[in-house]
Amino acid sequence: MKLIVPVLNRFDLLTRMVNSVDVEATVYVINNSGVRQDFVYDNALVNMHWVDLPSNLGVASSWNLGIKMLPFESRWFITSADTCFAPGDLSLLDSARDDAVSLCSVFPYWQTFAVGQRVVEQVGLFDEGLHPIYFEDNDYERRVANAGLPIVKLDLALTHDNSSTINSNIRFGARNNVTFVDNQKYFADKVEADNFGQGVWSLLRRRNNSWD
Protein backbone atom coordinates (compact mmCIF):
# COMPACT_ATOMS: atom_id res chain seq x y z
CA MET A 1 0.00 0.00 0.00
CA LYS A 2 1.08 3.57 -0.70
CA LEU A 3 -0.12 6.20 1.77
CA ILE A 4 0.06 9.92 1.00
CA VAL A 5 0.20 12.19 4.06
CA PRO A 6 0.71 15.96 4.09
CA VAL A 7 2.01 17.42 7.35
CA LEU A 8 2.65 20.96 8.61
CA ASN A 9 3.39 20.43 12.31
CA ARG A 10 2.71 17.97 15.15
CA PHE A 11 5.24 15.42 13.88
CA ASP A 12 4.60 13.50 17.09
CA LEU A 13 1.16 12.64 15.74
CA LEU A 14 2.69 11.66 12.41
CA THR A 15 4.91 9.23 14.34
CA ARG A 16 1.84 7.80 16.05
CA MET A 17 0.10 7.37 12.69
CA VAL A 18 3.09 5.63 11.10
CA ASN A 19 3.48 3.30 14.06
CA SER A 20 -0.21 2.31 13.80
CA VAL A 21 0.14 1.03 10.21
CA ASP A 22 -0.47 -2.74 10.21
CA VAL A 23 0.14 -3.58 6.52
CA GLU A 24 3.24 -3.30 4.38
CA ALA A 25 3.25 0.30 3.21
CA THR A 26 5.30 3.11 1.79
CA VAL A 27 4.32 6.38 3.45
CA TYR A 28 4.86 9.42 1.24
CA VAL A 29 5.23 12.38 3.60
CA ILE A 30 4.66 15.78 2.03
CA ASN A 31 6.44 17.97 4.57
CA ASN A 32 4.97 21.47 4.33
CA SER A 33 6.76 22.82 7.41
CA GLY A 34 9.74 24.22 5.51
CA VAL A 35 12.06 22.47 7.99
CA ARG A 36 13.78 19.12 7.52
CA GLN A 37 12.80 16.67 10.24
CA ASP A 38 14.83 14.03 12.07
CA PHE A 39 11.99 11.53 12.05
CA VAL A 40 12.16 8.37 14.14
CA TYR A 41 9.55 5.62 13.98
CA ASP A 42 9.29 2.00 15.03
CA ASN A 43 7.41 -0.02 12.43
CA ALA A 44 9.15 -2.65 10.30
CA LEU A 45 6.18 -2.73 7.90
CA VAL A 46 6.75 0.86 6.80
CA ASN A 47 9.14 2.50 4.36
CA MET A 48 9.25 6.30 4.41
CA HIS A 49 9.57 8.60 1.40
CA TRP A 50 9.99 12.26 2.35
CA VAL A 51 9.22 15.26 0.16
CA ASP A 52 10.60 18.34 1.94
CA LEU A 53 9.07 21.57 0.65
CA PRO A 54 10.32 25.13 1.25
CA SER A 55 6.81 26.45 1.97
CA ASN A 56 3.29 25.21 2.66
CA LEU A 57 1.59 23.86 -0.47
CA GLY A 58 -1.72 23.58 1.35
CA VAL A 59 -4.07 20.62 1.48
CA ALA A 60 -5.46 20.55 -2.07
CA SER A 61 -2.06 21.07 -3.70
CA SER A 62 -0.48 18.44 -1.43
CA TRP A 63 -3.15 15.87 -2.26
CA ASN A 64 -2.69 16.67 -5.94
CA LEU A 65 1.08 16.34 -5.64
CA GLY A 66 0.64 12.91 -4.10
CA ILE A 67 -1.53 11.82 -7.02
CA LYS A 68 0.89 13.29 -9.56
CA MET A 69 3.87 11.56 -7.91
CA LEU A 70 2.17 8.17 -8.33
CA PRO A 71 0.49 8.40 -11.76
CA PHE A 72 0.13 4.66 -12.37
CA GLU A 73 -1.95 3.80 -9.30
CA SER A 74 -5.55 2.60 -9.67
CA ARG A 75 -6.41 4.27 -6.35
CA TRP A 76 -4.69 6.87 -4.20
CA PHE A 77 -4.81 6.46 -0.43
CA ILE A 78 -4.54 9.72 1.49
CA THR A 79 -4.55 10.24 5.24
CA SER A 80 -4.18 12.98 7.80
CA ALA A 81 -1.02 12.98 9.88
CA ASP A 82 -3.08 13.17 13.09
CA THR A 83 -4.92 9.90 12.43
CA CYS A 84 -4.27 6.66 14.32
CA PHE A 85 -5.36 3.47 12.57
CA ALA A 86 -7.13 0.60 14.30
CA PRO A 87 -6.14 -2.95 13.33
CA GLY A 88 -7.74 -3.86 10.01
CA ASP A 89 -8.47 -0.28 8.91
CA LEU A 90 -5.93 -0.26 6.12
CA SER A 91 -6.99 -3.67 4.83
CA LEU A 92 -10.53 -2.30 4.59
CA LEU A 93 -9.29 0.88 2.91
CA ASP A 94 -7.47 -1.28 0.39
CA SER A 95 -10.86 -2.59 -0.77
CA ALA A 96 -11.73 0.86 -2.16
CA ARG A 97 -13.08 0.91 -5.72
CA ASP A 98 -11.28 2.57 -8.61
CA ASP A 99 -14.49 4.31 -9.76
CA ALA A 100 -15.36 5.88 -6.40
CA VAL A 101 -14.29 8.17 -3.61
CA SER A 102 -14.15 6.15 -0.39
CA LEU A 103 -14.47 8.11 2.86
CA CYS A 104 -14.69 7.36 6.57
CA SER A 105 -18.18 6.63 7.83
CA VAL A 106 -17.72 9.01 10.78
CA PHE A 107 -16.87 12.71 10.83
CA PRO A 108 -14.50 14.10 9.68
CA TYR A 109 -15.18 11.91 6.68
CA TRP A 110 -12.08 12.96 4.76
CA GLN A 111 -9.60 12.22 7.56
CA THR A 112 -8.54 9.13 5.60
CA PHE A 113 -9.85 8.40 2.12
CA ALA A 114 -9.22 6.85 -1.29
CA VAL A 115 -9.72 8.33 -4.74
CA GLY A 116 -10.08 5.99 -7.71
CA GLN A 117 -8.40 6.51 -11.06
CA ARG A 118 -11.73 6.74 -12.88
CA VAL A 119 -12.73 9.59 -10.59
CA VAL A 120 -9.56 11.54 -11.36
CA GLU A 121 -10.01 10.85 -15.08
CA GLN A 122 -13.56 12.20 -15.07
CA VAL A 123 -13.59 14.83 -12.32
CA GLY A 124 -9.99 16.01 -12.27
CA LEU A 125 -7.87 16.98 -9.29
CA PHE A 126 -8.64 19.01 -6.18
CA ASP A 127 -9.20 22.75 -6.58
CA GLU A 128 -5.91 24.46 -5.67
CA GLY A 129 -7.68 27.82 -5.49
CA LEU A 130 -8.79 26.67 -2.03
CA HIS A 131 -5.67 27.45 0.00
CA PRO A 132 -4.33 26.37 2.41
CA ILE A 133 -7.15 24.33 3.95
CA TYR A 134 -10.93 23.87 4.15
CA PHE A 135 -13.63 23.35 1.53
CA GLU A 136 -11.34 21.45 -0.87
CA ASP A 137 -13.10 18.28 0.31
CA ASN A 138 -16.61 19.78 0.07
CA ASP A 139 -15.83 21.00 -3.43
CA TYR A 140 -14.52 17.65 -4.60
CA GLU A 141 -17.41 15.71 -3.10
CA ARG A 142 -19.85 18.02 -4.89
CA ARG A 143 -18.03 17.54 -8.20
CA VAL A 144 -17.92 13.76 -7.81
CA ALA A 145 -21.66 13.64 -7.05
CA ASN A 146 -22.37 15.85 -10.07
CA ALA A 147 -20.42 13.42 -12.25
CA GLY A 148 -22.65 10.59 -11.04
CA LEU A 149 -19.79 8.67 -9.46
CA PRO A 150 -20.11 6.77 -6.16
CA ILE A 151 -19.14 8.19 -2.79
CA VAL A 152 -18.66 5.22 -0.48
CA LYS A 153 -18.43 5.30 3.33
CA LEU A 154 -16.09 2.75 4.94
CA ASP A 155 -16.49 1.68 8.58
CA LEU A 156 -12.96 2.56 9.63
CA ALA A 157 -12.35 2.43 13.38
CA LEU A 158 -9.47 4.92 13.39
CA THR A 159 -9.14 7.83 15.79
CA HIS A 160 -8.30 11.39 14.80
CA ASP A 161 -7.08 14.50 16.66
CA ASN A 162 -9.26 16.88 14.67
CA SER A 163 -7.77 20.32 13.84
CA SER A 164 -4.53 19.49 15.64
CA THR A 165 -2.54 21.77 13.31
CA ILE A 166 -4.41 24.97 14.12
CA ASN A 167 -5.08 24.04 17.74
CA SER A 168 -1.36 23.70 18.45
CA ASN A 169 -0.20 26.95 16.83
CA ILE A 170 -1.64 30.35 17.73
CA ARG A 171 -0.55 31.97 14.47
CA PHE A 172 -2.05 29.20 12.34
CA GLY A 173 -5.29 29.53 14.28
CA ALA A 174 -5.38 33.29 13.74
CA ARG A 175 -4.65 32.96 10.03
CA ASN A 176 -7.30 30.26 9.72
CA ASN A 177 -9.90 32.69 11.04
CA VAL A 178 -9.21 34.77 7.93
CA THR A 179 -8.58 32.11 5.30
CA PHE A 180 -11.54 29.95 6.33
CA VAL A 181 -13.92 32.81 5.53
CA ASP A 182 -12.17 33.49 2.23
CA ASN A 183 -12.30 29.84 1.17
CA GLN A 184 -15.92 29.60 2.28
CA LYS A 185 -16.79 32.48 -0.05
CA TYR A 186 -14.76 30.96 -2.90
CA PHE A 187 -16.65 27.68 -2.52
CA ALA A 188 -20.03 29.42 -2.18
CA ASP A 189 -19.33 31.40 -5.35
CA LYS A 190 -18.62 28.14 -7.24
CA VAL A 191 -21.90 26.65 -5.99
CA GLU A 192 -23.84 29.80 -6.90
CA ALA A 193 -22.35 29.79 -10.39
CA ASP A 194 -23.03 26.06 -10.93
CA ASN A 195 -19.28 25.72 -11.41
CA PHE A 196 -18.14 22.11 -11.25
CA GLY A 197 -14.68 22.80 -12.65
CA GLN A 198 -11.33 21.80 -11.18
CA GLY A 199 -10.35 25.43 -10.59
CA VAL A 200 -6.87 26.85 -10.87
CA TRP A 201 -3.99 27.75 -8.61
CA SER A 202 -3.84 31.53 -8.18
CA LEU A 203 -0.70 33.44 -7.20
CA LEU A 204 -2.81 36.17 -5.60
CA ARG A 205 -4.89 33.74 -3.54
CA ARG A 206 -1.77 31.79 -2.56
CA ARG A 207 -0.13 34.96 -1.24
CA ASN A 208 -3.22 36.45 0.38
CA ASN A 209 -4.10 33.19 2.15
CA SER A 210 -0.57 32.36 3.22
CA TRP A 211 0.13 30.75 6.59
CA ASP A 212 3.89 30.88 5.89
Listing of model-derived features with the role each one plays in the protein:
Residues 7-23:
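Short, well-formed alpha-helical segments that are part of the catalytic scaffolds
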Residues 73-84:
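Short beta-strand-to-loop acidic/aromatic patch adjacent to the donor-nucleotide binding site
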Residues 138-212:
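C-terminal catalytic/acceptor-binding lobe
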Residues 53-70, 110:
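Glycine-rich, basic loop-to-helix element that forms the pyrophosphate-binding segment
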Residues 82-95:
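Acidic donor-binding/catalytic loop of UDP-sugar-dependent glycosyltransferases
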Residues 98-107:
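A short, conserved acidic/glycine-rich loop-to-beta-strand motif
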Residues 117-134, 143-154:
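Aromatic-glycine-rich donor-binding/catalytic loop that engages nucleotide-sugar donors
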Residues 20-52:
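Acidic donor-binding segment of Leloir-type glycosyltransferases
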